[in-house]
Amino acid sequence: MSQTSLSERPPVPAYLAESRTYRWAYGGRFSPFFLDHAWVVEAILWGQGRRLMRLAAAEVAPGEIVLQPACVYGAFSRHLLGAIGAEGRLDVIDVLPGQVDNLRRKLAGRANVQIELGDAEDVPAQAYDVVSCFFLLHEVPQAKRRAIVAALLGAVRPGGRVVFVDYHRPRWWHPLGPLMALVHRTLEPFAASLWDQRLAELDAAGEFSWRTETYFGGLYQKTVATRQD
């Protein structure tokens, strides 16, 4: 992945720039200082953070070339690096300079990772064995989500996988269902639309096989799209 020059830097999307919640959570100067801690991630994900990271990393094999769109708080990148081993490579992109700088500090000294400014909608075609998209889709508007999914599907080689770990509609009996619906309406305005979004429907060309597993009473999903050889 080539270095991003100042002239090539992607603009910060309007949905990020205009949202007070997103500006505070991701774009603030001190956002990582307050939020980039394992206990914070576990609290936000109701104790399921490490489990979901392991489930995503389980889809990656040693020596593979992996793209991670969005920097992600917590130890997710380390899970992927552990899965690919010394012979693999991890590319990470994010549209926010502060997030890029923070992850570079966290992973300083790792030789097989590149972290650059970039938009998940603009990635190279068929360049990766795996794309691992961890809790990004619920944070973007539906039109942007469709564009991101299309780009990420296009980024894997024949036989490659795109792994989406994100929110899912919880079972009707889930005690946290009403609370999460309220949180998504008030703090994460694009998340609710993901509850009823079958990601396989975004595979317009039908070039992928799909499987979905849900966890924690259906609140979370891992959906894996595999490009046909």
Language-model-detected regions and their locations in the chain:
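Class I SAM-dependent methyltransferase SAM/SAH-binding core
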Residues: 67-121
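N-terminal, positively charged/glycine-rich alpha-helical extensions of SAM-dependent methyltransferases
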Residues: 1-36
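Conserved alpha-helix/loop element of class I SAM-dependent methyltransferases that forms part
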Residues: 43-62, 75, 79
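Helix-to-beta-strand junctions that scaffold the AdoMet/dcAdoMet cofactor pocket
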Residues: 61, 85, 140-141, 156-158
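A short acidic, Gly/Pro-enriched loop at the edge of an enzyme's catalytic core
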Residues: 121-131
